[in-house]
Amino acid sequence: DMHLELMRITRPGMTEKEVAGKLQSIAIGAGGDTSYPIILTVNGEILHTHTRDLIMQDGQLTLCDAGAETAMHYCGDLTRTIPTGKQFSSIQKDMYNIVLNAQIAAIEACKPGVLFKDIHALAATHLLEGLKNHGVIKGDPAEAVAHDVHTLFFQCGLGHMMGMDVHDMENLGEQYVGYTDELKKGTTFGWKSLRLGRALEPGFVVTVEPGLYFIPTLIDRWKAENKLAEFIDYNELEKFRNFTGIRIEDNLVITENGHRILGKHLPKTVAEIEALR
């Protein structure tokens, strides 16, 4: 309900905190509260920012990462990215569909026995395939992922366990919750932010949340080093330096034979979102 309200009320000229306040009131009015401070920003490339002081402008994207905590203290964690105005621009639509396709592929891969680490790599490959179609990536996307090219655009993890804490049992340590004695948590940029890597099991509740984040300072750093230039066309990438970011997130429970998306249907295609604008 919070994200549906986001799609209905967000307009240019509103402040980020104005929208966030209206969304929080929905969670409280339903007898619960938010499961973490609402992330609502037109600077989606700033991961998990809690600053909400900006006036939203037409032509921008608004990223909302918000979940409710029920009276039984179970948490939700959902993200949608919408146009601040009525419609996505052409390039916003293209980038959005890249993320959506990656998310759909990742969700379809979620079933018992599959390493979530491998699903993360699958999503990253889909992201780079999409960017290759726009001339930003060169060569084979899967090989590029093997060289960690995706970490320039997808710096965080695909998802995490969720339960009575939004990052379930995180205080025990991510190595103990998201990994095993045989499967160690990564230590390199990007991979070290993947909270869950182990094989999925029936009953696991997880988030699936790929994104594209164009961080100007990070782009400049890689470009100055000519880092992985065999895979990255920095001249084409320059066109996207101020694009900001997109994330799409849903919550799944792993079943005996696959998965089930939790909650009622929440619009996430371009057509569905624009119909509510």
Where are these regions (language model features)?
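Active-site neighborhoods and metal-handling regions in enzymes and metal-associated proteins
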Residues: 1-277
